[in-house]
């Protein structure tokens, strides 16, 4: 597992955050092919994104822009609904989120993903916009399980996803 944190300006909109994610992934791909790089031929070629709030909106932008992604986790996504997302996507929203309410952000983001694409929406009771960074175990639990299923192809994690407290999904 290789992780990358992309820091953008606090005022950057989801598009800018998504562009930063796609540029970061492109840098990983380039380093994997560059002799002399510490990553040369060490990456498995499986890439996914995750982000929170405007970064969650950025993940949907990245999923629209980079068709090589294998998974996307949008936590408490804030931003406009994307069309053309063809990457398996988990949308996590918080029932108590006043910044990116489920009804106006998470649910429309989920609905905008075609039914032909594996997708899941989890609503965390009591969850709020800062919940993932404030030790929100459920966001981490569902996000990790989703990435394990779609990045690694490890279906042993499916029961954890299916046990989510409030979910909508087309994943079998």
Regions found by a protein language model. Name each.
Residues 67-79, 121:
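A conserved short beta-strand
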Residues 1-12:
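Conserved alpha/beta-hydrolase
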Residues 13-57:
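Gly/Ser-rich "nucleophile elbow"/oxyanion-hole loop immediately N-terminal to the catalytic nucleophile
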């Amino acid at each position: 597992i290789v992780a990358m944190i992309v820091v953008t300006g606090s005022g950057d909109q989801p598009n800018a955050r998504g562009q930063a994610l796609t540029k970061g992934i492109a840098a990983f791909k380039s380093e994997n092919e560059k002799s002399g790089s510490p990553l040369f031929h060490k990456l498995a070629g499986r890439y996914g994104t995750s982000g929170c709030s405007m970064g969650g909106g950025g993940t949907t932008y990245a999923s629209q822009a980079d068709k090589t992604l294998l998974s996307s986790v949008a936590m408490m996504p804030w931003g406009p609904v994307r069309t053309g997302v063809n990457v398996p996507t988990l949308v996590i929203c918080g029932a108590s989120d006043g910044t990116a309410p489920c009804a106006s952000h998470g649910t429309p983001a989920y609905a905008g993903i075609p039914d032909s694409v594996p997708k899941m929406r989890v609503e965390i009771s009591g969850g709020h916009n800062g919940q993932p960074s404030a030790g929100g175990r459920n966001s981490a639990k569902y996000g990790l399980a989703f990435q394990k299923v779609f990045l690694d192809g490890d279906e042993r994690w499916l029961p954890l996803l299916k046990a989510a407290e409030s979910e909508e999904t087309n994943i079998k």
